[in-house]
Amino acid sequence: MMLTGSHGTFCSGVALTRSLVLTAAHCVLPGADYKLVEFDSARQPLLKDVATITRHPGFDVNAVLRHRVTADVALIKLGAPLMVLPARLAPEGVAVTAGDPFVVAGYGVAVRGDGKTGGVVRAARLVATGQPGTLQIRLADPAGKGERAGLGACTGDSGAPVYREVGGTLAVIGVVSWSTGPALSEGCGGLTGVTPLMRYRAWIVEQAAKLGSPLPP
């Protein structure tokens, strides 16, 4: 899913039910109006009204700016159902180790600073690097390992789902929070910072039920 804000920003997200979208909390800050963008079979955009936005109470926007750990998770309740097939939330207890493969899918730009390249869903296969855990996961293109330019999240990919194969199918294990250029420079194509959902899964399930969009067991 693609999310647009009245301040001119855009992010990505993923439908957990036909009326509930998961994204990054920093994508839906107070002080702006937001719309979900769904594309029909002819690739024509359809704007969906947002009914409510629920950010995790532990979210700290300053932590995201510093690439630090925070509860960068939010749920968007829509005013009308989507046409898409919802994604599956990864179950509890999925371990992550360095080298594990992931798939990131978002609507971000292909070239930093070129907004015209955004708005098209793209997927990248990345691997966990460093010391991944329940607080933060850092992904990199296995070819460049974060030191050379490669695949990764860019502007507009914040909030995008991060998938991991669980039981033979892909499940959402995290959302994109930030990105860097090669060797921790500014930009894209280096590291992709992910907020894993393990610590926030219970909150997501609880809030989904309160919002009238319970997740499947």
Model-derived segments and their meaning:
Residues 15, 29, 45-47, 66-70, ...:
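Extracellular/periplasmic catalytic domains that process cell-envelope and extracellular macromolecules
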Residues 10, 15-28, 36, 43, ...:
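C-terminal subregion of chymotrypsin/trypsin-like serine protease catalytic domains
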Residues 20, 32, 100, 157-160:
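Surface-exposed loop/turn positions
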Residues 151-155:
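Glycine-centered low-complexity coil/loop motifs and glycine-rich tracts
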Residues 1-8, 12:
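N-terminal activation segment of mature serine protease catalytic domains
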Residues 8-10, 21, 27-29, 60, ...:
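Solvent-exposed loop/turn segments at secondary-structure junctions
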Residues 70-73, 78-150, 190, 197-202:
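Chymotrypsin/trypsin-fold serine protease catalytic domain
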Residues 34-84, 89-94, 116:
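Conserved catalytic-core segment of clan PA serine endopeptidases
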